[in-house]
UniProtKB/Swiss-Prot annotation:
Organism: Debaryomyces hansenii (strain ATCC 36239 / CBS 767 / BCRC 21394 / JCM 1990 / NBRC 0083 / IGC 2968) (Yeast)
EC number of the protein: 4.1.1.33
Disordered as annotated region, ranges: 367-388
One GO CC term on file: cytosol
Pathway the protein acts in: Isoprenoid biosynthesis; isopentenyl diphosphate biosynthesis via mevalonate pathway; isopentenyl diphosphate from (R)-mevalonate: step 3/3
Organism phylogeny: Eukaryota, Fungi, Dikarya, Ascomycota, Saccharomycotina
Name of a matching Pfam family: MVD-like_N
NCBIfam families named in the record: mevDPdecarb
InterPro entries the record matches: GHMP_kinase_C_sf (IPR036554), Mev_decarb (IPR005935), Mev_diP_decarb (IPR029765), MVD-like_N (IPR053859), Mvd1_C (IPR041431), Ribosomal_Su5_D2-typ_SF (IPR020568), Ribsml_uS5_D2-typ_fold_subgr (IPR014721)
Binding site for (R)-5-diphosphomevalonate: 19-22, 74, 153-158, 209
Protein name per the record: Diphosphomevalonate decarboxylase
Source domain of life: Eukaryota
Family that this chain belongs to: Belongs to the diphosphomevalonate decarboxylase family.
Binding partners and assembly: Homodimer.
């Protein structure tokens, strides 16, 4: 039996200008444009291997060792679009194998908790789409491929690029102009770092999709956000990235996180993603910036309580020094020589704050999807390792 295989990795991205709200649920078209930073795959990534064979009678997906249902409309939409593009190639070249007619086996693994507010669906769908596009030898560029990833998970389209990325909401009803574009590559501003404080490993109470629908349907503040606040902030944030102006970038990032959680709170019933630990971390970062007399650290929170703190390499000792002072008992500091940190800060915070954080992930801006020589699939097109 002939088995065609391909593997790719894709990164997590963390939005600094938030995507929240759909204008078309089936196509995953957003109500506003968004911006994100792609994080290093050394710390957070999804690896996906795909196989196609004439002998595979159906599509199958294994996620983190377990066979999962492929009945999700989102996944089916991605596979259908990829097959359509492959069919176009096959119709123009009769010598290439008819992979579009074969079943595909998809094996995917994350190196971080799934559905814990760490953008697992973004990396997952990005890796899925890129690995199959690679298998199918599709000629489309990453912006074009991002439109397919978007149908799987809106924020997945931003994981198609490294560095600093914008998802342009577009205007077309068919979504043809709703795609990800590079604002600046990793090499433009390589000293951006991020500390992720994992506040909860649990699945969140209100999934993003249902939360968005509630906000769009019930929040008056949301309309103000998408019409007045985000369009200007989108331009200003892109400009701050191009100028490598951290103070402006950080200010806009924190304001947009707060704006996003404000519209969640303004929804009926209100949606609470931040917990007490999250709020104390927010206060800690504001105290740090106040002490420094300028913004050297910026928090952002997605649809969950986990904090992502952005800072520049040159301020690492000060920023991580304050975080280490209160979270030294939490795992995740192993990759850093903590003796280099400035822990002399007189900033006061709850000494029990560390109890609300399960681990810390120290990472930085990173590259986009990469082809991988590592494969999760054996020569029969089945997972090399399957959970019991």
């Amino acid at each position: 039996m002939t088995v065609y295989t391909s593997s790719a990795t894709a990164p997590v991205n963390i939005a600094t200008l938030k995507y929240w709200g759909k204008r078309d649920k089936s196509l995953n078209l957003p109500t506003n444009s968004s911006i994100s930073v792609t994080l290093s795959q050394n710390d957070l990534r999804t690896l996906t291997s795909v196989a196609a064979s004439e002998d595979f009678k159906e599509d199958k997906l294994w996620l983190n060792g377990k066979l999962e249902s492929l009945e999700s409309e989102r996944t089916k939409a991605c596979l259908a679009d990829l097959r359509t593009l492959r069919k176009e190639l096959e119709s123009n070249d009769s010598s290439i194998p008819k992979l579009s007619q074969f079943g595909v086996h998809i094996v995917s693994e994350n190196n971080f908790p799934t559905a814990a507010g760490l953008a697992s669906s973004a990396a997952g769908f990005a890796a899925l789409v890129v690995s199959i596009a690679k298998l199918y030898e599709l000629p489309q560029n990453m912006s074009e491929i991002s439109k397919i990833a978007r149908k799987g998970s809106g924020s997945a389209c931003r994981s198609l690029f490294g560095g600093y990325v914008a998802w342009e909401m577009g205007q077309e009803t068919n979504g043809e102009d709703s795609k990800a574009v590079e604002v600046a590559p990793l090499s433009h501003w390589p000293n951006m770092k991020a500390a992720i404080l994992v506040v909860s490993d649990d699945k969140k109470d209100t999934p993003s999709t249902s939360g968005m629908q509630t906000t769009v349907a019930t929040s008056d503040l949301f309309q103000w956000r998408i019409k007045e606040v985000v369009p200007k902030r989108f331009d200003d944030m892109k400009d701050s990235i191009l100028r490598k102006d951290f103070a402006t970038f950080g200010d806009l990032t924190m304001k947009d996180s707060n704006s996003f959680h404000a519209v969640c709170l303004d929804s009926t019933p209100p949606i609470f993603y931040l917990n007490d630990t999250s709020k104390k971390i927010i206060k800690l970062i504001h105290e740090l910036n106040k002490r420094e007399g300028k913004i050297i650290a910026a928090y952002t929170f997605d649809a969950g309580p986990n904090a992502v703190i952005y800072y520049e390499q040159e301020n690492e000792s000060k920023v991580l020094g304050v975080i280490y002072k209160y979270f030294s008992k939490v795992s995740g500091w192993e990759k850093l020589d903590t003796k280099t940190l400035d822990t002399t800060s007189d900033i006061q915070a709850d000494p029990e704050l560390y109890k609300g954080v399960s681990k810390i992930i120290l990472t930085e801006v990173g590259q986009g999807p990469q082809g991988s020589s590592e494969s999760l699939i054996n020569d029969k097109g089945l997972p090399k390792a399957v959970a019991n």
